[in-house]
From Swiss-Prot:
Organism, as annotated: Mesobuthus eupeus
UniProt keyword annotation of rRNA-binding present: no
Keyword entries, A-Z: Disulfide bond, Ion channel impairing toxin, Neurotoxin, Potassium channel impairing toxin, Secreted, Signal, Toxin
Top-rank taxon, per record: Eukaryota
Pfam families according to UniProt: Scorpion_toxin_alpha-beta
Annotated disulfide bonds: 58-78, 65-83, 69-85
InterPro entries from the UniProt entry: Long_scorpion_toxin_alpha/beta
One GO MF term attached to the UniProt entry: potassium channel regulator activity
One GO CC annotation: extracellular region
UniProt name for this protein: Potassium channel toxin MeuTXKbeta3-meucin-24
Protein family membership: Belongs to the long chain scorpion toxin family. Class 2 subfamily.
Signal peptide: 1-22
Cellular localization per UniProt: Secreted
Chain ranges of the BetaSPN-type CS-alpha/beta domain: 55-88
Amino acid sequence: MMKQQFFLFLAVIVMISSVIEAGRGREFMSNLKEKLSGVKEKMKNSWNRLTSMSEYACPVIEKWCEDHCQAKNAIGRCENTECKCLSK
């Protein structure tokens, strides 16, 4: 009888610690999601601010624009942060 109570007591302790650890895991994941969404918003805002200034954005966009237009058999130009494909 004493052995059964002892093992039951150990099982209860293990179950309680598992529940506590699971709660910490959820808390950790929610904190991680919050931080990642904050970083995503900061990057998005920075990108929007960068692309709103054509003198800074065109060098960033131009390489993508050239590749994009080359696939269409055209020449890519960046004008006012917009990619324009000109026929060859």
